[in-house]
């Protein structure tokens, strides 16, 4: 039975049967926490890595001691958006310069550039635009083994040792059993060559190290080197072909390649993965020992020969510092297993070392050295502190290389396991903090080079830290990252959900990731390890499918960057599921048996069924006895992302349609009249709160003042918090941001309460659409192919109206001929055109504008012309303006209109930061209310999308028995083949809930079932099948069959017909081919392509075809003459030669081919380059009526040439195109989409 639950300010009837153990974590913590880590630790790590910087003599040392970020940014967030500034704070670093010769120490605080700050909502404001840094999903550093079969079916093992940065090592086996190695992607050579180069010189030493093995013998046979020196030389030849090899250079190269922390870095995660993979204990457990294993320190026997090694013993053997174990195989063969010599420090030190903060395993030989050298506790601690970089090395060690080679040999005996690179245990997340850290590192390493050079050049005495440090490389690297990295994206701000999803997005693309073209099917596919970590539903359709994913609802990211999912612990002693929550990574969870969240439990937490459906090793789903269970899911919605969790009855939808539903919710435009869904899932409130679209109380207190613009809350300590609300601001996506208070004066407020609604929220819940009364029936064919028939009432009552705000800007620059001027005094413009401009020449707020209207009057100086004596005299007498100007005003573009809601003016005089060469900048904001109309796209939450085909008058719409007309009619045929049955259940439950006055929460995988819905329908007084009799609005007669009617939540998507409809008569042409440009943005024409030409050819419509290919396209002379003929009412003349044909001839001539055009009588046709001055069309004069209604004389060709010249003078021409008649005759075809029934 449904039970009431209070979510925020609204009570919903919940059908949930599972009690919520834990709240959803903060949904944007992946952004906020990562950036916080970067400021606290990430920056420190980079400075520690880079310092000290020494000069080439080792005399001067520069250290970065400490750093601080100023608390006070120059502008606040809103001001940054207005001024196109970056929301940032200055980074100051304390730098110490030590001169070893003189012992002099200089300290200075150095400014290291402005560092972008993250807003509370997890975004950055860069140059006035809100951006999001998307987290990247990359392959984790580590050692990976893969298996293939050759033609004969023989097992071939290949492996890769991947660092965070540095040279790769790749091992592979060929069909002759030779194991070879590639160093840093060079040509392969036997693996023994690498071992010799690393100091294990003779064959006997190598066999002694790795043990007897036929593969080793085959490899040694192929290896032509016999000593350490030969090995080094051989490696050097492959790494540096063509250079003369010497033993010294080879040795230093190999050292630099692998053992220099500056060149080779595993990072924390790489060391962790190496130790996990190469550790002895996982490889020898459950195997049989070939000899007695004795503790070297105490002499006790761990395991006798022939005994099985348990997991606990294996761990003890490893931690005792034993690194080599011989195992006995089934055929009595001995196999040697070599670990990488890392142990748990606590097994060797009996006093408390928690203050050293060592969580990882440590290198045993180094630890042994320390323990042998010191006996006092404090001394040992100090030694550990000073040698921490050797104990936990960030680069690869010889031990690691030997262990990885040993693993390669062992795998043939099934010791160790093959890795799956798509498993989330082997893929990690690089969040904002780490991505930024990498950029800063790049910047600092460039800076290091500059500092070293300056140290040698500058005078020793006068040198200061300030003079050495050049901050340009660092700030350039950061700027480049935020401005142009693939992972720094313009935030999708269509609605709160799209904003939240964007911040939780995981992308496998980007620098260091995959590319679309190379990504195969396996990488994109859903993997069993995605469960509870990445959503299997929400991913884009198209080329990025599976490469861009969304984080699971409850997922967190651990210190190594692996995604963790929460589970409830199952207590095996009491056989109950506890409320103790453990976060597990993908490879940890594989060791356990996990039950699903909707497995029925008794009141005291015991399983109802004794056999439980569980996920076991490698994601297999089995029925297991309850005693085998280790963990249980925490919530059914942990599997999916936030957007998917907002689809009610998700479990009844086909996955393909659910994917579309999740993606289309992100495209819903915020409505003027918002309404929360009647059928929700209960996560709406949390999504809105964490997205940052609503205003949340920072502290508890009492509301003292509540107006449309601000809320003031008096805190318990007597201070006041002021919240300024945003009114009619433009979002990144051109939708309207408007915040309205939802509390009253005198209300008691608790910290964390939502106190004001934002766009597309209602009482703090995400409200993307409207609850509409829907019937599934056909109506006169207007439902064909998913089309939607809507009631005119939705238009009249503004139920689906949205406000869109567009921004236009105009800048007055300095030109070569003088500065441009913003003014009301525009040449050749009538009073009617400037009636809405103020005395500065800028449109007033509140004016209604249409396309072509002037927003900002601006004039640009024109080139000085030679004046006649008379004109000079007149100018001298009347003091006329000495220079000619032309009108370059900002006009409303084609097809746009609306009301001016805001105008912002920035000038040099007021001290505003403007880009070079700009004296004044004006921004106008035009708001347009768009009602729903034919051609707009709408959708439900189940992937059921369609286009509006007709708006039917209210009286013609079918109506229910009580006289209520329907809002929307949908096609019932759209359901069976698409299998999104969730929409039908939503409609039925919606009908009952609306009648009973409920708001419902039906969570995913834990919501209402069909019997709950039938009971609710019955309670509301409807038949149990939810079908009702409808009556035809035109005749009043009832329809033959009963029809499914109910309430569905319907969204209006941002694919609006107004933004897509476009028509052109004349307009801009492309510069080279002289063909009309394409696309609405360029005010282009419709392309008449190859196939359309075939259609006309098939009809034999020769004249139309000729016109389309010449005078309507790129026959420059012909199109002017045609214009002339139309204006004068004469016959249209013969077409000339198209410009693109001339271009083709030029292309052929550029290949030294002499091309002539001949008639059928072999007479050569002269292809003219351009219009000559004395051509007849040059004499065509045309009366042009200007804006003032006066008749001017005008020569078309000159006008065209002038226009072209002016265009060429503009400094910032982006796409060079010639504007022709468009400037003279402004013609427009008015398309009213209501005339077309689609």
Curated annotation (Swiss-Prot):
Spans traversing the lipid bilayer: none
Stored Pfam families:
RNA_pol_Rpb2_1, RNA_pol_Rpb2_2, RNA_pol_Rpb2_3, RNA_pol_Rpb2_45, RNA_pol_Rpb2_6, RNA_pol_Rpb2_7
InterPro entries in the cross-refs: DNA-dir_RNA_pol_bsu_ext_1_sf (IPR042107), DNA-dir_RNA_pol_bsu_external_1 (IPR019462), DNA-dir_RNA_pol_su2 (IPR015712), DNA-dir_RNAP_su2_dom (IPR007120), DNA-dir_RNAP_su2_hyb_sf (IPR037033), RNA_pol_bsu_bac (IPR010243), RNA_pol_bsu_CS (IPR007121), RNA_pol_bsu_protrusion (IPR007644)
Catalyses: RNA(n) + a ribonucleoside 5'-triphosphate = RNA(n+1) + diphosphate
Keywords, alphabetical? DNA-directed RNA polymerase, Nucleotidyltransferase, Transcription, Transferase
Q: What is its EC number?
A: 2.7.7.6
Q: Show the GO cellular component annotation of the record.
A: DNA-directed RNA polymerase complex
Among Gene3D superfamilies, the record links this protein to:
2.40.50.100, 2.40.50.150, 3.90.1100.10, DNA-directed RNA polymerase, beta subunit, external 1 domain, DNA-directed RNA polymerase, subunit 2, domain 6, RNA polymerase alpha subunit dimerisation domain, RNA polymerase Rpb2, domain 2
Name a single GO biological process: DNA-templated transcription
One molecular function GO term is:
DNA-directed RNA polymerase activity
- The reply on keyword Transferase is yes
Question: Known HAMAP family for this protein?
Answer: RNApol_bact_RpoB
Family, per entry: Belongs to the RNA polymerase beta chain family.
Q: How does it assemble?
A: The RNAP catalytic core consists of 2 alpha, 1 beta, 1 beta' and 1 omega subunit. When a sigma factor is associated with the core the holoenzyme is formed, which can initiate transcription.
Summarizing the function annotation, the protein's role is: DNA-dependent RNA polymerase catalyzes the transcription of DNA into RNA using the four ribonucleoside triphosphates as substrates.
Q: What is this protein called?
A: DNA-directed RNA polymerase subunit beta
Its gene name is rpoB
């Amino acid at each position: 039975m449904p039970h009431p639950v209070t979510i925020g300010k609204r009570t919903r009837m919940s059908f949930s049967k599972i009690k919520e153990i834990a709240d959803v974590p903060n949904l944007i913590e992946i952004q906020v926490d990562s950036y916080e880590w970067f400021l606290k630790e990430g920056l420190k790590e980079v400075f520690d890595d880079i310092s000290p910087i020494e000069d080439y003599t080792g005399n001067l040392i520069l250290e970065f001691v400490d750093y601080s970020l100023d608390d006070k940014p120059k502008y606040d967030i809103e001001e940054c958006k207005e001024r196109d500034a970056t929301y940032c704070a200055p980074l100051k670093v304390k730098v110490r310069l030590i001169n070893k010769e003189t012992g002099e120490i200089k300290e200075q605080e150095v400014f290291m550039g402005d560092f972008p700050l993250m807003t509370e909502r997890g975004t950055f404001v860069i140059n006035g635009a809100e951006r999001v840094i998307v987290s990247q999903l990359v392959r984790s550093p580590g050692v990976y083994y893969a298996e293939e079969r050759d033609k004969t079916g023989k097992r071939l093992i290949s492996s890769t040792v991947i660092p965070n940065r540095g040279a790769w090592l790749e091992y592979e086996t060929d069909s002759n059993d030779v194991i070879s190695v590639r160093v840093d992607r060079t040509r392969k050579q036997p693996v023994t060559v690498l071992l010799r180069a690393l100091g294990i010189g003779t064959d006997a030493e190598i066999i002694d190290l790795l043990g007897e093995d036929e593969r080793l013998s085959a490899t040694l046979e192929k290896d032509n080197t016999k000593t350490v020196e030969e090995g080094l030389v051989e490696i050097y030849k492959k790494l540096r072909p063509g250079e003369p090899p010497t033993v010294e250079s080879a040795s230093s190269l190999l050292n630099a390649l692998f053992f220099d922390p500056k060149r080779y870095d595993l990072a924390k995660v790489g060391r962790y993965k190496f130790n996990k993979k190469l550790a002895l204990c996982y490889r020898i457990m459950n195997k049989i020992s070939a000899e007695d294993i004795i503790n070297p320190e105490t002499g006790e026997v761990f395991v006798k020969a022939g005994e099985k090694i348990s997991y606990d013993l294996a761990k003890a053997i490893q931690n005792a510092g034993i690194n080599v174990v011989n195992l006995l195989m089934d055929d009595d063969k001995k196999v040697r297993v070599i670990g990488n010599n890392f142990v748990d420090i606590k097994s060797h030190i009996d006093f408390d070392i928690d203050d050293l903060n060592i969580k990882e395993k440590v290198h045993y030989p180094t630890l042994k050295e320390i323990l042998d050298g010191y006996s006092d506790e404090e001394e040992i601690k100090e030694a550990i502190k000073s040698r921490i970089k050797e104990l936990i090395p960030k680069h690869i060690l010889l031990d690691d290389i030997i262990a990885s080679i040993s693993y390669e040999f062992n795998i043939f005996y099934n010791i160790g396991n093959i890795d799956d690179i798509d498993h989330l245990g082997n893929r990690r997340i690089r969040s904002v903090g780490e991505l930024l850290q990498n950029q800063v590192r790049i910047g600092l390493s460039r800076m290091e080079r500059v500092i070293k050079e300056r140290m040698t050049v500058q005078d020793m005495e006068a040198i200061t830290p300030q003079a050495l440090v050049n901050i340009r490389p660092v700030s350039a690297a950061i700027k480049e990252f935020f401005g142009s990295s693939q992972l720094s994206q313009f935030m999708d701000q269509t609605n709160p959900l799209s904003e939240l999803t964007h911040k939780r997005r995981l992308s496998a693309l980007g620098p260091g990731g995959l590319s679309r073209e190379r990504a195969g099917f396996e990488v994109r596919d859903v993997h069993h390890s995605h469960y509870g970590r990445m959503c299997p539903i929400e991913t884009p359709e198209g080329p990025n499918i599976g490469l861009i994913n969304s984080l699971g609802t409850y997922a967190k990211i651990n210190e190594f960057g692996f995604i963790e999912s929460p589970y409830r612990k199952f207590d095996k002693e009491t056989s109950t599921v506890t409320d103790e929550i453990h976060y597990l990574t993908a490879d940890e969870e594989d060791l356990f048996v996990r039950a699903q969240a909707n497995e029925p439990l008794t009141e005291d937490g015991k399983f109802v069924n004794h056999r439980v459906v569980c996920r076991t090793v490698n994601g297999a789903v089995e029925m297991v006895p309850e005693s085998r269970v280790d963990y249980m899911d925490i919530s059914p919605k942990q599997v999916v992302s936030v957007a998917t969790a907002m689809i009610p009855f998700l479990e009844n939808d086909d996955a393909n349609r659910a994917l579309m539903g999740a993606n289309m919710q992100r495209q819903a435009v915020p409505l003027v009249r918002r309404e929360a869904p009647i059928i929700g899932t209960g996560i709406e409130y949390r999504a809105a709160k964490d997205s940052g679209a609503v205003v949340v109380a920072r502290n508890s207190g009492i509301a003292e003042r509540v107006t449309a613009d601000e809320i003031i809350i008096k805190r318990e300590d007597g201070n006041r918090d002021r919240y300024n609300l945003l009114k009619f601001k433009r979002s990144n996506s051109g939708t309207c941001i408007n915040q309205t208070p939802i509390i009253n004066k005198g209300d008691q407020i608790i910290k964390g309460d939502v106190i004001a609604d934002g766009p597309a929220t209602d009482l703090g819940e995400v409200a993307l659409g409207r609850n509409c009364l829907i019937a599934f029936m056909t109506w006169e064919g207007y439902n064909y192919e998913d089309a939607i028939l809507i009631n005119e009432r939705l238009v009249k009552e503004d139920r689906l109206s949205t406000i869109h705000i567009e921004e236009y800007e105009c800048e007055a620059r300095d030109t070569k001929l003088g500065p441009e001027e913003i003014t009301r005094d525009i040449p050749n413009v009538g009073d009617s055109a400037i009636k809405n401009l103020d005395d500065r020449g800028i449109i007033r707020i509140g004016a209604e504008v249409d396309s072509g209207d002037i927003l900002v009057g601006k004039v640009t100086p024109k080139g000085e012309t030679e004046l006649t004596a008379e004109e000079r005299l007149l100018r001298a007498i009347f003091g006329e303006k000495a220079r000619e100007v032309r009108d370059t005003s900002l006009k409303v573009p084609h097809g746009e209109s609306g009301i001016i809601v805001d105008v912002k003016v920035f000038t040099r005089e007021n001290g505003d930061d403007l880009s070079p060469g700009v004296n004044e900048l004006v921004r106008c904001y035009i708001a347009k209310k768009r009602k729903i109309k034919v051609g707009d796209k709408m959708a439900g939450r189940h992937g059921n999308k369609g286009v509006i085909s007709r708006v039917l008058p209210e009286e013609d719409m079918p109506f229910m028995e009580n006289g209520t007309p329907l809002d929307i009619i949908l096609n019932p045929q759209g359901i069976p083949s698409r299998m999104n049955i969730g929409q039908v259940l939503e409609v039925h439950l919606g009908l009952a809930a609306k009648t009973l006055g409920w708001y419902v929460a039906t969570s995913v995988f834990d919501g209402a079932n069909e019997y709950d819905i039938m009971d609710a329908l019955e309670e509301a007084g409807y038949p149990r099948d939810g079908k009702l009799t409808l009556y035809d609005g035109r005749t009043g007669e009832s329809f033959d069959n009963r029809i499914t009617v109910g309430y569905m939540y319907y969204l209006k998507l941002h694919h609006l017909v107004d933004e897509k409809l476009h028509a052109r008569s004349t307009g801009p042409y492309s510069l080279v081919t002289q063909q009309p440009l394409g696309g609405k943005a360029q005010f282009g024409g419709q392309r008449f392509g190859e196939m359309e030409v075939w259609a006309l050819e098939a009809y034999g419509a020769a004249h139309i075809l000729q016109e389309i290919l010449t005078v309507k396209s790129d026959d420059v002379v012909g199109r002017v003459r045609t214009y002339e003929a139309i204006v004068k009412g004469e016959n249209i003349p013969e077409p000339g030669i198209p410009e693109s044909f001339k271009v083709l001839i030029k292309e052929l001539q550029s290949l030294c081919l002499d091309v002539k055009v001949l008639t059928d009588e072999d007479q050569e046709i002269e292809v003219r380059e351009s219009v000559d001055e004395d051509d007849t069309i040059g004499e065509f004069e045309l009366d042009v009526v200007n804006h003032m209604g006066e008749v001017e004389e005008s020569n078309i060709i000159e006008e065209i040439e002038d226009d072209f010249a002016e265009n060429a003078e503009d400094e910032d021409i982006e796409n060079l195109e010639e504007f022709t008649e468009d400037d003279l005759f402004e013609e427009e075809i008015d398309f009213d989409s209501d005339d077309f029934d689609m």
